[in-house]
């Protein structure tokens, strides 16, 4: 395994509590005396400077510095690796992030930056679960996408214990090594790959719902009842249920966020292999619209929308309306109903369901067409 050139670290608060908070201003050791004074004065650059005079393996330096020192010593990362610190949405998190970036810039790392994880805090457990862990997954996935999985490693030593579980799943999904150092360990350890694989076909089937929740944050559960029923237990792993003013909403779970971020990018790079062949231009046909009330009221807008789908997605041959509902708005998305690819159009109060005829001939190809349609939809929202 080649050493990582980009290291993504979760950040906790052990540097402050109990380490620096436990120092005494009258400590006879001059370094600890400086540290105590700088910490009490909240002079974070001075804290970084004082820490730099200590061995990085000393416990006073905190979990992040200790673990990175072990990573570098064992050759798991290059000496001047890019460093990204994912810290909590708290005052202490921001302050420790500032100390760490100042410390490692002094040490010669060309990139040492922080990423605040919105919602990652311990004052609101519900927000921690529904926002914080999801946002951690989102930030780490984007860093790995920016720098490439072959260049990255995750250091999951610092922070809340739940972050370790998220980090391990991220590493499994992204193909990135994950490291952890307990305070009683002499050295850092790597988590072995798990003997399971995430299912890209499950993501393609449910890509519409996952993309919707990623974009909107929370969506009323009633508007997605059919999709939840079709998804069964697999889909339940990807979503959290949240009550807002007495109404149930759906949001992506941390696992759902990881699966969606991972497979969306994988699909975009492998779509030519997964999708059926394009339809010839001569075989594409105009949309067929029924004569029902909702369709009649929105006929021209519907015609333009269905024509744009046929023109914009190479594998689509034509679209035709199936049924409409004047009372139940549904989110715009594409899904599989049996062997039929279906989409939904809505103006926010009325909905029309339409079928999409494509060049797909197998279940896997139909699932890939659903993913391509939802990707097209996200680009045109």
Predicted regions and their residues:
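Conformationally flexible catalytic loops at phosphate/diphosphate-handling active centers
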Residues: 154
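Polyanion-engaging groove/track-forming segments
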Residues: 161
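Glycine-rich beta-strand-to-loop/alpha-helix junction loops that act as flexible
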Residues: 157-158
């Amino acid at each position: 395994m080649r050493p990582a050139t980009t290291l993504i670290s979760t950040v906790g608060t052990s540097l402050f509590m109990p380490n620096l908070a436990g120092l005494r201003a009258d400590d006879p050791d001059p370094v600890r005396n400086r540290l105590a004074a700088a910490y009490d004065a909240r002079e974070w650059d001075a804290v970084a400077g004082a820490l730099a005079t200590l061995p990085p393996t000393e416990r006073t330096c905190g979990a992040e510095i200790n673990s990175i020192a072990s990573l570098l010593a064992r050759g798991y990362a290059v000496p001047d690796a890019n460093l990204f610190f994912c810290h909590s949405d708290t005052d202490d998190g921001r302050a420790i992030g500032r100390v760490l970036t100042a410390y490692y810039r002094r040490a010669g790392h060309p990139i040492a930056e922080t990423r605040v994880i919105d919602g990652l805090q311990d004052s609101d457990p519900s927000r921690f679960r529904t926002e914080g862990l999801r946002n951690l997954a989102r930030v780490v996935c984007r860093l790995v996408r920016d720098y490439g999985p072959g260049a990255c490693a995750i250091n999951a030593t610092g922070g809340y214990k739940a972050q370790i579980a998220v980090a391990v799943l991220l590493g499994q999904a992204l193909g990135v090594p994950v490291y952890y150092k307990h305070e009683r360990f002499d050295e850092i350890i790597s988590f072995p790959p798990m003997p399971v694989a995430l299912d890209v076909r499950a993501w393609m089937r449910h890509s519409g719902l996952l993309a919707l929740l990623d974009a909107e944050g929370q969506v009323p559960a009633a508007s997605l009842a059919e999709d939840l029923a079709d998804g069964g237990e697999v889909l339940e792993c990807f979503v959290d249920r949240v009550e807002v003013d007495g109404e149930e909403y759906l949001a992506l779970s941390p696992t759902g966020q990881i699966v969606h971020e991972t497979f969306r990018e994988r699909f975009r790079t492998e779509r030519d292999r997964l999708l059926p062949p394009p339809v010839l231009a001569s075989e594409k046909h105009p949309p067929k619209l029924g004569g029902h009330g909702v369709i009649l009221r929105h006929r021209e807008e519907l015609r333009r929308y269905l024509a744009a789908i046929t023109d914009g997605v190479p594998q689509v041959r034509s679209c035709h309306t199936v049924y409409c509902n004047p009372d139940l708005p549904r989110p715009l998305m594409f899904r599989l109903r049996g062997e039929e690819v279906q989409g939904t159009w809505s103006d926010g109060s009325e909905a029309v369901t339409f079928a999409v005829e494509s060049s797909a001939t197998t279940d896997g190809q139909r699932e890939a067409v659903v993913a391509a349609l939802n990707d097209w939809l996200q680009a045109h929202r």
